[in-house]
Amino acid sequence: MKRNSINIHHVTSFSSSPFWCVFFLVLLCKTSTNALVKQPPNETTPAIIVFGDSIVDAGNNDDIMTTLARCNYPPYGIDFDGGIPTGRFCNGKVATDFIAGKFGIKPSIPAYRNPNLKPEDLLTGVTFASGGAGYVPFTTQLSTYLFIYKPLLFLKGGIALSQQLKLFEEYVEKMKKMVGEERTKLIIKNSLFMVICGSNDITNTYFGLPSVQQQYDVASFTTLMADNARSFAQKLHEYGARRIQVFGAPPVGCVPSQRTLAGGPTRNCVVRFNDATKLYNVKLAANLGSLSRTLGDKTIIYVDIYDSLLDIILDPRQYGFKVVDKGCCGTGLIEVALLCNNFAADVCPNRDEYVFWDSFHPTEKTYRIMATKYFERYV
């Protein structure tokens, strides 16, 4: 039986006291995050360590033949250094690459499972993120990109968040062998940990699988997501991380593929998808605030990317964009991962005019703008 059933079309207009309590917690988080993210005086950020899904995957899925959620082939990477497809779901760099550059750490963050990874890369940070991952375990076990009532194409997920933590444990042991236990602890303590996940849970698992909707309503499913995100952040804290940023989910109802599949004849942003995302983000921010207070550590924070991306989508010309409802690859309506390839899909020549690279992921230019917004707000 479904629990706590709600009308998701009107989630933003709730007037019940529990909702508003959570809402004000979000406001509190937003007004205090600037001070929370900064390092203590005279300390630098030695590394950025990333967990999550395809938004920040840099190639961890490249050699996993059981998943279609990989993109280590052209035209992916067409604007990356040397035009090489690295496994990033983008035409070039992703947001965490730009953030690493702005911190002066390195130009990009490599995938931990990259066979060409150099030992020195471990000292300055890697990404464990994997396309298809989610906070709900079965999101990774069976994630899908294409749905019209019934699944058209099943994409078995890559590396679950629990397994990403196992890889992190392996990473820590390698670090200890390189620089010793004490320096490893210091690097982990001062490094910036970023967790970016949740999009697949909402679009693919909840709204893509009728069986999940029979088991959960939006309220209970987003609570499950937010609780699992809190647990993940707490695990990182137990590993010694002291600068943890957990990013909210973006407005997934406005990505091209979801407009195509659920946006009606005019391909509008899907309101119920965005409402569910906003509800999840509110709960996530509240959970992280609660965790911070429980641990007595104010360096676990919520980072908003919903408004950052939505602002670009709603006012594209301000940022030099012309196309917001289609991706640059192929028709721009549905192509992502396997469907975006040199044999079946052409690529737009004017990529800087597109907000989205494929039907699910932003272009390098969009990521650059979002990284700038991040620095203006949180650093």
From Swiss-Prot:
EC nos: 3.1.1.-
Glycosylation sites: 42
One MF annotation (Gene Ontology) recorded for this entry: lipase activity
This protein's name: GDSL esterase/lipase EXL2
Subcellular location: Secreted
Gene responsible for this protein: EXL2
Family: Belongs to the 'GDSL' lipolytic enzyme family.
InterPro entries: GDSL (IPR001087), GDSL_lipolytic_enzyme (IPR050592), Lipase_GDSL_AS (IPR008265), SGNH_hydro_sf (IPR036514), SGNH_plant_lipase-like (IPR035669)
Signal peptide: 1-35
Alphabetized UniProt keyword annotations: Glycoprotein, Hydrolase, Lipid degradation, Lipid metabolism, Secreted, Signal
Lineage: Eukaryota, Viridiplantae, Streptophyta, Embryophyta, Tracheophyta
Pfam family, one: Lipase_GDSL
A GO-annotated cellular component: extracellular region
